[in-house]
Protein backbone atom coordinates (compact mmCIF):
# COMPACT_ATOMS: atom_id res chain seq x y z
CA UNK A 1 0.00 0.00 0.00
CA UNK A 2 1.35 3.42 -1.07
CA UNK A 3 2.30 5.79 1.72
CA UNK A 4 0.93 9.38 1.45
CA UNK A 5 3.35 12.07 2.40
CA UNK A 6 1.62 14.83 4.47
CA UNK A 7 3.77 17.49 2.76
CA UNK A 8 2.56 16.29 -0.65
CA UNK A 9 -1.07 16.42 0.50
CA UNK A 10 -0.75 20.00 1.70
CA UNK A 11 1.03 20.93 -1.56
CA UNK A 12 -1.79 19.31 -3.56
CA UNK A 13 -4.48 21.19 -1.61
CA UNK A 14 -2.62 24.50 -2.09
CA UNK A 15 -2.39 23.81 -5.84
CA UNK A 16 -6.12 23.04 -6.02
CA UNK A 17 -6.97 26.28 -4.17
CA UNK A 18 -4.73 28.28 -6.52
CA UNK A 19 -6.34 26.78 -9.63
CA UNK A 20 -9.90 27.30 -8.38
CA UNK A 21 -11.87 29.69 -10.63
CA UNK A 22 -13.57 32.05 -8.22
CA UNK A 23 -14.93 34.48 -10.85
CA UNK A 24 -18.73 34.79 -10.76
CA UNK A 25 -21.21 36.94 -12.65
CA UNK A 26 -22.46 39.65 -10.30
CA UNK A 27 -26.08 39.44 -11.40
CA UNK A 28 -28.78 40.29 -8.93
CA UNK A 29 -31.17 37.44 -9.53
CA UNK A 30 -34.45 36.23 -8.12
CA UNK A 31 -37.01 33.48 -8.65
CA UNK A 32 -40.51 33.79 -10.06
CA UNK A 33 -43.01 32.66 -7.42
CA UNK A 34 -46.26 33.65 -9.18
CA UNK A 35 -47.40 34.59 -12.70
CA UNK A 36 -50.91 35.83 -13.45
CA UNK A 37 -52.54 38.33 -15.83
CA UNK A 38 -49.27 39.92 -16.90
CA UNK A 39 -48.11 40.43 -13.30
CA UNK A 40 -45.08 38.53 -11.93
CA UNK A 41 -44.15 38.18 -8.25
CA UNK A 42 -40.41 37.59 -7.82
CA UNK A 43 -38.62 36.43 -4.66
CA UNK A 44 -35.18 37.99 -4.29
CA UNK A 45 -33.94 40.93 -6.39
CA UNK A 46 -33.05 42.87 -3.23
CA UNK A 47 -31.36 45.66 -5.20
CA UNK A 48 -34.20 46.24 -7.68
CA UNK A 49 -35.12 49.89 -8.30
CA UNK A 50 -38.61 51.26 -8.93
CA UNK A 51 -39.25 51.27 -12.69
CA UNK A 52 -36.17 49.12 -13.42
CA UNK A 53 -36.19 46.68 -16.34
CA UNK A 54 -36.30 43.06 -15.17
CA UNK A 55 -35.04 40.38 -17.57
CA UNK A 56 -36.77 36.98 -17.71
CA UNK A 57 -35.83 33.81 -19.56
CA UNK A 58 -36.69 33.80 -23.26
CA UNK A 59 -35.68 37.45 -23.82
CA UNK A 60 -38.84 38.77 -22.12
CA UNK A 61 -38.68 41.98 -20.09
CA UNK A 62 -40.74 43.39 -17.25
CA UNK A 63 -40.83 46.55 -15.19
CA UNK A 64 -40.56 46.61 -11.39
CA UNK A 65 -43.53 48.52 -9.94
CA UNK A 66 -44.00 47.04 -6.44
CA UNK A 67 -40.98 46.83 -4.12
CA UNK A 68 -42.02 44.83 -1.06
CA UNK A 69 -40.04 43.52 1.90
CA UNK A 70 -39.35 40.06 0.52
CA UNK A 71 -40.60 40.22 -3.06
CA UNK A 72 -40.86 42.41 -6.15
CA UNK A 73 -44.05 42.86 -8.21
CA UNK A 74 -43.27 43.42 -11.89
CA UNK A 75 -45.48 44.00 -14.91
CA UNK A 76 -44.50 42.08 -18.06
CA UNK A 77 -43.97 44.16 -21.21
CA UNK A 78 -45.16 41.71 -23.82
CA UNK A 79 -46.15 38.05 -23.83
CA UNK A 80 -46.10 36.48 -20.37
CA UNK A 81 -47.42 33.03 -21.37
CA UNK A 82 -43.90 31.53 -21.56
CA UNK A 83 -43.08 32.51 -17.97
CA UNK A 84 -43.40 29.88 -15.22
CA UNK A 85 -42.91 29.62 -11.48
CA UNK A 86 -39.35 28.72 -10.57
CA UNK A 87 -37.76 30.50 -13.52
CA UNK A 88 -34.99 33.02 -12.87
CA UNK A 89 -35.37 36.80 -13.13
CA UNK A 90 -32.48 39.26 -13.34
CA UNK A 91 -31.99 42.95 -12.58
CA UNK A 92 -30.63 44.88 -15.55
CA UNK A 93 -29.74 48.15 -13.81
CA UNK A 94 -31.49 50.00 -16.66
CA UNK A 95 -34.63 52.14 -16.82
CA UNK A 96 -36.94 51.64 -19.82
CA UNK A 97 -35.76 53.55 -22.90
CA UNK A 98 -37.22 54.05 -26.39
CA UNK A 99 -35.60 55.16 -29.68
CA UNK A 100 -35.93 58.88 -30.48
CA UNK A 101 -35.03 61.15 -33.37
CA UNK A 102 -36.08 62.21 -36.88
CA UNK A 103 -35.78 58.58 -38.04
CA UNK A 104 -39.14 57.86 -36.35
CA UNK A 105 -41.06 60.41 -38.44
CA UNK A 106 -43.34 58.72 -40.96
CA UNK A 107 -43.31 55.47 -39.00
CA UNK A 108 -45.80 53.46 -36.92
CA UNK A 109 -44.26 51.96 -33.76
CA UNK A 110 -45.43 50.06 -30.68
CA UNK A 111 -45.17 51.36 -27.11
CA UNK A 112 -41.51 50.28 -26.90
CA UNK A 113 -40.54 51.97 -30.18
CA UNK A 114 -40.39 48.80 -32.30
CA UNK A 115 -41.64 49.33 -35.89
CA UNK A 116 -44.97 47.64 -36.73
CA UNK A 117 -45.60 49.15 -40.17
CA UNK A 118 -43.64 46.62 -42.25
CA UNK A 119 -41.24 49.29 -43.55
CA UNK A 120 -38.12 47.70 -42.11
CA UNK A 121 -36.05 48.54 -39.02
CA UNK A 122 -35.70 52.05 -37.60
CA UNK A 123 -32.05 53.02 -37.43
CA UNK A 124 -32.42 55.56 -34.65
CA UNK A 125 -29.09 56.88 -33.40
CA UNK A 126 -30.37 57.75 -29.92
CA UNK A 127 -32.57 56.30 -27.19
CA UNK A 128 -34.02 58.17 -24.22
CA UNK A 129 -35.75 57.36 -20.94
CA UNK A 130 -39.51 56.87 -21.04
CA UNK A 131 -39.99 58.48 -17.60
CA UNK A 132 -38.39 61.92 -17.40
CA UNK A 133 -38.76 64.88 -15.07
CA UNK A 134 -40.57 67.86 -16.61
CA UNK A 135 -38.60 71.10 -17.19
CA UNK A 136 -38.46 73.35 -14.13
CA UNK A 137 -40.01 76.79 -13.73
CA UNK A 138 -36.82 78.68 -14.69
CA UNK A 139 -36.40 76.66 -17.91
CA UNK A 140 -39.87 77.60 -19.17
CA UNK A 141 -41.05 80.49 -21.30
CA UNK A 142 -44.57 81.88 -21.55
CA UNK A 143 -46.75 80.70 -24.42
CA UNK A 144 -46.95 83.35 -27.16
CA UNK A 145 -46.88 81.54 -30.52
CA UNK A 146 -49.97 79.89 -32.01
CA UNK A 147 -50.70 76.32 -33.05
CA UNK A 148 -53.31 76.71 -35.79
CA UNK A 149 -55.73 73.76 -35.77
CA UNK A 150 -57.46 74.82 -38.98
CA UNK A 151 -60.83 74.88 -37.19
CA UNK A 152 -62.60 78.26 -37.18
CA UNK A 153 -64.39 77.43 -33.92
CA UNK A 154 -61.13 76.56 -32.13
CA UNK A 155 -58.72 79.14 -33.59
CA UNK A 156 -61.14 82.01 -32.95
CA UNK A 157 -62.72 81.11 -29.58
CA UNK A 158 -60.36 78.60 -27.93
CA UNK A 159 -56.91 79.37 -29.39
CA UNK A 160 -54.03 77.00 -28.66
CA UNK A 161 -50.42 78.15 -28.17
CA UNK A 162 -47.14 76.29 -28.60
CA UNK A 163 -46.32 74.58 -25.31
CA UNK A 164 -49.93 74.54 -24.08
CA UNK A 165 -51.94 71.52 -22.85
CA UNK A 166 -55.47 71.72 -24.27
CA UNK A 167 -57.88 68.93 -23.34
CA UNK A 168 -60.37 67.63 -25.91
CA UNK A 169 -63.24 66.14 -23.91
CA UNK A 170 -66.60 64.65 -24.86
CA UNK A 171 -68.71 61.51 -25.13
CA UNK A 172 -67.93 58.77 -27.62
CA UNK A 173 -68.70 59.61 -31.25
CA UNK A 174 -68.56 63.39 -30.87
CA UNK A 175 -65.56 64.02 -33.14
CA UNK A 176 -62.66 64.10 -30.63
CA UNK A 177 -60.23 62.03 -32.72
CA UNK A 178 -61.33 63.83 -35.90
CA UNK A 179 -60.43 67.18 -34.32
CA UNK A 180 -57.00 65.93 -33.21
CA UNK A 181 -56.22 64.38 -36.62
CA UNK A 182 -57.28 67.61 -38.35
CA UNK A 183 -54.95 69.55 -36.03
CA UNK A 184 -52.08 67.28 -37.18
CA UNK A 185 -53.02 67.70 -40.86
CA UNK A 186 -53.13 71.50 -40.38
CA UNK A 187 -49.41 71.52 -39.39
CA UNK A 188 -48.34 70.72 -42.97
CA UNK A 189 -46.50 74.02 -43.55
CA UNK A 190 -45.89 75.05 -39.94
CA UNK A 191 -42.74 73.01 -39.30
CA UNK A 192 -44.32 71.40 -36.22
CA UNK A 193 -43.47 67.69 -35.82
CA UNK A 194 -46.35 65.54 -34.57
CA UNK A 195 -46.77 62.41 -32.44
CA UNK A 196 -50.09 60.55 -32.34
CA UNK A 197 -50.45 58.06 -29.46
CA UNK A 198 -53.31 55.57 -29.88
CA UNK A 199 -54.18 53.91 -26.54
CA UNK A 200 -56.61 51.00 -26.26
CA UNK A 201 -58.21 51.56 -29.67
CA UNK A 202 -59.35 49.00 -32.23
CA UNK A 203 -56.67 48.20 -34.80
CA UNK A 204 -59.10 48.92 -37.64
CA UNK A 205 -59.61 52.46 -36.26
CA UNK A 206 -55.85 53.03 -35.99
CA UNK A 207 -55.35 51.71 -39.55
CA UNK A 208 -57.91 54.25 -40.81
CA UNK A 209 -56.11 57.09 -39.01
CA UNK A 210 -52.72 56.06 -40.45
CA UNK A 211 -54.22 55.80 -43.95
CA UNK A 212 -55.78 59.27 -43.67
CA UNK A 213 -52.47 60.76 -42.45
CA UNK A 214 -50.73 59.11 -45.40
CA UNK A 215 -53.29 60.39 -47.93
CA UNK A 216 -52.97 63.98 -46.71
CA UNK A 217 -49.16 63.86 -46.58
CA UNK A 218 -49.21 64.38 -42.81
CA UNK A 219 -47.49 61.06 -41.97
CA UNK A 220 -44.20 62.48 -43.28
CA UNK A 221 -43.86 64.67 -40.16
CA UNK A 222 -45.76 62.38 -37.74
CA UNK A 223 -44.86 59.38 -35.58
CA UNK A 224 -47.75 57.07 -34.65
CA UNK A 225 -47.34 55.17 -31.35
CA UNK A 226 -49.77 52.26 -31.00
CA UNK A 227 -50.90 50.32 -27.93
CA UNK A 228 -54.10 48.76 -29.26
CA UNK A 229 -56.96 47.22 -27.26
CA UNK A 230 -55.54 43.73 -27.81
CA UNK A 231 -52.16 44.56 -26.24
CA UNK A 232 -51.30 44.07 -22.55
CA UNK A 233 -52.37 46.76 -20.07
CA UNK A 234 -48.69 47.44 -19.33
CA UNK A 235 -48.07 48.66 -22.88
CA UNK A 236 -51.23 50.80 -22.84
CA UNK A 237 -49.92 52.37 -19.62
CA UNK A 238 -46.42 52.98 -21.05
CA UNK A 239 -47.41 54.24 -24.54
CA UNK A 240 -48.15 57.92 -23.66
CA UNK A 241 -44.80 58.27 -21.87
CA UNK A 242 -42.98 56.72 -24.85
CA UNK A 243 -44.71 59.11 -27.25
CA UNK A 244 -43.90 62.06 -24.98
CA UNK A 245 -40.20 61.13 -24.97
CA UNK A 246 -40.24 61.03 -28.79
CA UNK A 247 -41.83 64.51 -28.85
CA UNK A 248 -39.39 65.88 -26.26
CA UNK A 249 -36.49 65.06 -28.59
CA UNK A 250 -37.63 67.94 -30.84
CA UNK A 251 -38.57 70.29 -27.98
CA UNK A 252 -35.16 70.01 -26.34
CA UNK A 253 -33.40 70.84 -29.62
CA UNK A 254 -35.21 74.11 -30.24
CA UNK A 255 -37.98 72.75 -32.47
CA UNK A 256 -41.75 72.63 -32.02
CA UNK A 257 -43.76 69.43 -31.59
CA UNK A 258 -47.41 68.50 -31.09
CA UNK A 259 -48.53 65.32 -29.32
CA UNK A 260 -52.03 63.82 -29.24
CA UNK A 261 -52.95 61.26 -26.53
CA UNK A 262 -55.98 59.34 -27.79
CA UNK A 263 -57.16 58.74 -25.14
CA UNK A 264 -56.06 59.06 -21.52
CA UNK A 265 -59.29 57.51 -20.15
CA UNK A 266 -58.13 54.16 -21.52
CA UNK A 267 -54.65 54.67 -20.07
CA UNK A 268 -56.23 55.28 -16.64
CA UNK A 269 -58.28 52.07 -17.01
CA UNK A 270 -55.11 50.12 -17.95
CA UNK A 271 -53.28 51.57 -14.94
CA UNK A 272 -56.22 50.72 -12.68
CA UNK A 273 -56.06 47.12 -13.93
CA UNK A 274 -52.32 46.89 -13.23
CA UNK A 275 -52.70 48.47 -9.76
CA UNK A 276 -55.52 46.16 -8.71
CA UNK A 277 -53.57 43.10 -9.90
CA UNK A 278 -50.57 44.35 -7.90
CA UNK A 279 -52.94 44.40 -4.86
CA UNK A 280 -52.66 48.15 -4.34
CA UNK A 281 -55.56 49.64 -2.35
CA UNK A 282 -58.32 51.04 -4.60
CA UNK A 283 -59.79 54.52 -4.16
CA UNK A 284 -62.59 56.46 -5.87
CA UNK A 285 -64.11 54.52 -8.82
CA UNK A 286 -61.56 51.77 -7.93
CA UNK A 287 -58.70 53.87 -9.33
CA UNK A 288 -55.47 53.82 -7.29
CA UNK A 289 -54.52 56.82 -5.18
CA UNK A 290 -51.83 58.02 -7.61
CA UNK A 291 -53.98 58.23 -10.76
CA UNK A 292 -53.73 62.04 -10.62
CA UNK A 293 -49.93 61.76 -10.62
CA UNK A 294 -50.18 59.31 -13.54
CA UNK A 295 -51.53 62.12 -15.75
CA UNK A 296 -49.89 65.17 -14.14
CA UNK A 297 -46.34 63.88 -14.59
CA UNK A 298 -47.14 63.14 -18.24
CA UNK A 299 -48.83 66.44 -19.10
CA UNK A 300 -46.32 68.61 -17.21
CA UNK A 301 -43.70 67.47 -19.73
CA UNK A 302 -45.55 69.44 -22.43
CA UNK A 303 -44.04 72.91 -22.18
CA UNK A 304 -42.34 75.79 -23.93
CA UNK A 305 -38.66 75.92 -22.95
CA UNK A 306 -36.48 79.01 -23.25
CA UNK A 307 -33.39 79.51 -25.42
CA UNK A 308 -31.01 79.10 -22.44
CA UNK A 309 -32.43 75.61 -21.73
CA UNK A 310 -32.07 74.58 -25.40
CA UNK A 311 -28.53 75.97 -25.60
CA UNK A 312 -27.47 74.12 -22.45
CA UNK A 313 -29.14 70.89 -23.58
CA UNK A 314 -27.46 70.96 -27.02
CA UNK A 315 -24.09 72.08 -25.57
CA UNK A 316 -24.22 75.34 -27.49
CA UNK A 317 -25.07 73.79 -30.88
CA UNK A 318 -28.51 75.48 -31.02
CA UNK A 319 -28.51 79.13 -29.96
CA UNK A 320 -31.35 81.65 -29.62
CA UNK A 321 -34.17 79.18 -30.28
CA UNK A 322 -36.97 78.15 -27.95
CA UNK A 323 -38.53 74.69 -28.11
CA UNK A 324 -42.06 73.56 -27.40
CA UNK A 325 -44.15 70.44 -26.94
CA UNK A 326 -47.89 71.08 -27.22
CA UNK A 327 -50.22 68.38 -25.87
CA UNK A 328 -53.78 67.58 -26.94
CA UNK A 329 -54.94 64.93 -24.46
CA UNK A 330 -58.33 63.36 -25.18
CA UNK A 331 -60.75 62.20 -22.46
CA UNK A 332 -63.93 60.25 -23.12
CA UNK A 333 -66.84 61.05 -20.80
CA UNK A 334 -69.83 58.85 -20.01
CA UNK A 335 -73.19 60.54 -20.76
CA UNK A 336 -71.60 64.00 -20.64
CA UNK A 337 -70.43 63.62 -17.03
CA UNK A 338 -67.40 65.91 -16.80
CA UNK A 339 -67.45 65.66 -12.99
CA UNK A 340 -66.23 62.04 -12.93
CA UNK A 341 -62.83 61.31 -11.36
CA UNK A 342 -60.48 61.18 -14.37
CA UNK A 343 -62.13 64.05 -16.34
CA UNK A 344 -61.93 66.45 -13.36
CA UNK A 345 -58.30 65.44 -12.77
CA UNK A 346 -57.24 66.16 -16.34
CA UNK A 347 -59.31 69.37 -16.54
CA UNK A 348 -57.41 70.67 -13.49
CA UNK A 349 -54.02 69.69 -14.95
CA UNK A 350 -54.50 71.18 -18.43
CA UNK A 351 -54.54 74.82 -19.61
CA UNK A 352 -58.10 74.66 -20.90
CA UNK A 353 -60.56 72.29 -22.55
CA UNK A 354 -62.53 71.95 -25.76
CA UNK A 355 -65.85 70.39 -24.78
CA UNK A 356 -67.61 68.47 -27.56
CA UNK A 357 -71.31 67.82 -26.98
CA UNK A 358 -73.27 64.90 -28.45
CA UNK A 359 -76.50 66.95 -28.70
CA UNK A 360 -74.73 69.53 -30.90
CA UNK A 361 -73.07 66.78 -32.93
CA UNK A 362 -76.39 65.02 -33.54
CA UNK A 363 -78.06 68.29 -34.56
CA UNK A 364 -75.49 68.72 -37.34
CA UNK A 365 -73.25 71.33 -35.67
CA UNK A 366 -69.79 69.90 -36.37
CA UNK A 367 -67.28 70.41 -34.85
CA UNK A 368 -69.67 70.09 -31.88
CA UNK A 369 -67.85 72.65 -29.71
CA UNK A 370 -69.81 73.95 -26.72
CA UNK A 371 -68.53 77.54 -26.66
CA UNK A 372 -70.00 78.14 -23.19
CA UNK A 373 -67.81 75.75 -21.18
CA UNK A 374 -64.85 75.43 -23.55
CA UNK A 375 -61.93 77.66 -22.58
CA UNK A 376 -58.27 78.27 -23.35
CA UNK A 377 -56.45 79.67 -20.33
CA UNK A 378 -53.20 80.73 -22.03
CA UNK A 379 -53.88 80.60 -25.78
CA UNK A 380 -55.21 84.17 -26.03
CA UNK A 381 -51.65 85.52 -25.81
CA UNK A 382 -50.65 83.26 -28.70
CA UNK A 383 -53.37 84.26 -31.18
CA UNK A 384 -52.29 85.87 -34.44
CA UNK A 385 -53.08 89.60 -34.63
CA UNK A 386 -55.70 89.35 -37.36
CA UNK A 387 -57.62 86.44 -35.80
CA UNK A 388 -57.48 88.07 -32.35
CA UNK A 389 -58.85 91.33 -33.75
CA UNK A 390 -61.64 89.70 -35.74
CA UNK A 391 -62.72 86.95 -33.35
CA UNK A 392 -63.58 89.15 -30.36
CA UNK A 393 -67.34 89.14 -30.89
CA UNK A 394 -67.80 85.53 -31.94
CA UNK A 395 -67.91 83.86 -28.52
CA UNK A 396 -70.25 86.60 -27.22
CA UNK A 397 -72.53 86.29 -30.25
CA UNK A 398 -72.78 82.51 -29.80
CA UNK A 399 -73.31 82.67 -26.02
CA UNK A 400 -76.04 85.32 -26.37
CA UNK A 401 -77.63 83.38 -29.22
CA UNK A 402 -77.90 80.17 -27.12
CA UNK A 403 -79.43 82.12 -24.24
CA UNK A 404 -81.88 84.04 -26.43
CA UNK A 405 -82.81 80.97 -28.49
CA UNK A 406 -83.88 79.15 -25.31
CA UNK A 407 -85.86 82.21 -24.20
CA UNK A 408 -87.40 82.84 -27.66
CA UNK A 409 -89.11 79.42 -27.60
CA UNK A 410 -91.56 80.79 -25.03
CA UNK A 411 -91.89 84.37 -26.32
CA UNK A 412 -94.40 85.06 -29.08
CA UNK A 413 -93.38 88.57 -30.15
CA UNK A 414 -89.76 89.68 -30.04
CA UNK A 415 -88.40 93.19 -30.47
CA UNK A 416 -86.21 94.00 -33.49
CA UNK A 417 -82.92 94.05 -31.55
CA UNK A 418 -83.56 90.53 -30.19
CA UNK A 419 -84.54 89.27 -33.65
CA UNK A 420 -81.34 90.75 -35.07
CA UNK A 421 -79.24 89.06 -32.40
CA UNK A 422 -80.95 85.73 -33.06
CA UNK A 423 -80.40 86.07 -36.82
CA UNK A 424 -76.74 86.97 -36.36
CA UNK A 425 -76.18 84.13 -33.86
CA UNK A 426 -77.82 81.65 -36.21
CA UNK A 427 -75.50 82.70 -39.04
CA UNK A 428 -72.38 82.61 -36.84
CA UNK A 429 -73.35 79.08 -35.69
CA UNK A 430 -73.71 78.05 -39.34
CA UNK A 431 -70.39 79.72 -40.22
CA UNK A 432 -68.55 77.80 -37.48
CA UNK A 433 -69.52 74.48 -39.09
CA UNK A 434 -66.70 72.78 -40.94
CA UNK A 435 -66.17 69.52 -42.80
CA UNK A 436 -63.68 66.94 -41.60
CA UNK A 437 -60.16 66.87 -43.12
CA UNK A 438 -60.54 70.43 -44.46
CA UNK A 439 -58.45 72.63 -42.17
CA UNK A 440 -58.53 76.35 -43.02
CA UNK A 441 -55.58 78.72 -43.28
CA UNK A 442 -55.38 82.02 -41.36
CA UNK A 443 -56.39 83.99 -44.47
CA UNK A 444 -59.43 81.79 -45.15
CA UNK A 445 -60.63 82.15 -41.56
CA UNK A 446 -60.00 85.90 -41.55
CA UNK A 447 -61.89 86.45 -44.83
CA UNK A 448 -65.12 84.75 -43.71
CA UNK A 449 -65.06 86.08 -40.12
CA UNK A 450 -64.54 89.63 -41.42
CA UNK A 451 -67.64 89.27 -43.62
CA UNK A 452 -69.65 87.98 -40.64
CA UNK A 453 -68.50 90.77 -38.30
CA UNK A 454 -69.34 93.49 -40.81
CA UNK A 455 -72.89 92.18 -41.21
CA UNK A 456 -72.58 91.02 -44.82
CA UNK A 457 -74.12 87.63 -43.99
CA UNK A 458 -77.45 89.09 -42.85
CA UNK A 459 -78.71 89.18 -46.45
CA UNK A 460 -77.76 85.53 -47.06
CA UNK A 461 -80.26 82.78 -46.08
CA UNK A 462 -78.89 80.57 -43.28
CA UNK A 463 -79.03 77.39 -45.39
CA UNK A 464 -76.84 79.06 -48.05
CA UNK A 465 -74.02 80.17 -45.70
CA UNK A 466 -71.96 77.04 -46.47
CA UNK A 467 -72.30 77.49 -50.24
CA UNK A 468 -71.47 81.22 -49.90
CA UNK A 469 -68.30 80.43 -47.92
CA UNK A 470 -67.07 77.91 -50.50
CA UNK A 471 -67.73 80.25 -53.44
CA UNK A 472 -66.30 83.30 -51.66
CA UNK A 473 -63.02 81.56 -50.77
CA UNK A 474 -62.69 80.31 -54.36
CA UNK A 475 -63.18 83.92 -55.54
CA UNK A 476 -60.58 85.21 -53.03
CA UNK A 477 -57.95 82.77 -54.29
CA UNK A 478 -58.74 83.61 -57.93
CA UNK A 479 -59.02 87.40 -57.64
CA UNK A 480 -57.24 88.31 -54.40
CA UNK A 481 -54.43 85.74 -54.20
CA UNK A 482 -51.87 88.38 -53.17
CA UNK A 483 -54.07 89.55 -50.26
CA UNK A 484 -54.55 85.94 -49.06
CA UNK A 485 -50.79 85.36 -49.30
CA UNK A 486 -50.04 88.54 -47.36
CA UNK A 487 -52.44 87.60 -44.54
CA UNK A 488 -50.99 84.07 -44.33
CA UNK A 489 -47.41 85.41 -44.28
CA UNK A 490 -47.76 88.31 -41.83
CA UNK A 491 -51.07 87.64 -39.98
CA UNK A 492 -51.25 91.41 -39.45
CA UNK A 493 -54.44 93.47 -39.41
CA UNK A 494 -54.51 97.13 -40.42
CA UNK A 495 -56.76 99.62 -42.22
CA UNK A 496 -55.33 98.66 -45.60
CA UNK A 497 -56.12 94.94 -45.16
CA UNK A 498 -59.55 95.77 -43.69
CA UNK A 499 -60.31 98.00 -46.69
CA UNK A 500 -59.24 95.33 -49.19
CA UNK A 501 -61.31 92.66 -47.40
CA UNK A 502 -64.31 95.01 -47.37
CA UNK A 503 -64.12 95.77 -51.11
CA UNK A 504 -63.57 92.06 -51.88
CA UNK A 505 -66.70 90.88 -50.05
CA UNK A 506 -68.80 93.72 -51.49
CA UNK A 507 -67.64 93.00 -55.06
CA UNK A 508 -68.32 89.29 -54.58
CA UNK A 509 -71.85 89.81 -53.22
CA UNK A 510 -72.71 92.19 -56.08
CA UNK A 511 -71.36 90.10 -58.96
CA UNK A 512 -71.59 86.44 -57.93
CA UNK A 513 -74.30 83.91 -57.19
CA UNK A 514 -73.89 80.80 -55.08
From Swiss-Prot:
Short name of one Pfam family for this protein?
Answer: ATP-synt_ab_N
What domain of life? Bacteria
Positions annotated to bind ATP: 170-177
Ordered alphabetically, the record's keywords are:
ATP synthesis, ATP-binding, Cell inner membrane, Cell membrane, CF(1), Hydrogen ion transport, Ion transport, Membrane, Nucleotide-binding, Translocase, Transport
Recorded catalytic reaction(s): these are: ATP + H2O + 4 H(+)(in) = ADP + phosphate + 5 H(+)(out)
A single cellular component GO annotation: plasma membrane
Among Gene3D superfamilies, the record links this protein to: 2.40.30.20, ATP synthase alpha/beta chain, C-terminal domain, P-loop containing nucleotide triphosphate hydrolases
Which residues are listed under the site Required for activity?
Answer: 374
What is the membrane topology here? Peripheral membrane protein
Subcellular location as annotated:
Cell inner membrane
Q: What class of enzyme is it?
A: translocase
PANTHER family in UniProt: ATP SYNTHASE SUBUNIT ALPHA, MITOCHONDRIAL
Q: What is the protein's known function?
A: Produces ATP from ADP in the presence of a proton gradient across the membrane. The alpha chain is a regulatory subunit.
**Which family does this protein fall into?**
Belongs to the ATPase alpha/beta chains family.
Q: Which NCBIfam families match?
A: atpA, PRK13343.1
Question: What's the protein called, per UniProt?
Answer: ATP synthase subunit alpha
Query: What's the source species for this entry?
Result: Psychrobacter sp. (strain PRwf-1)
Q: Which gene encodes it?
A: atpA
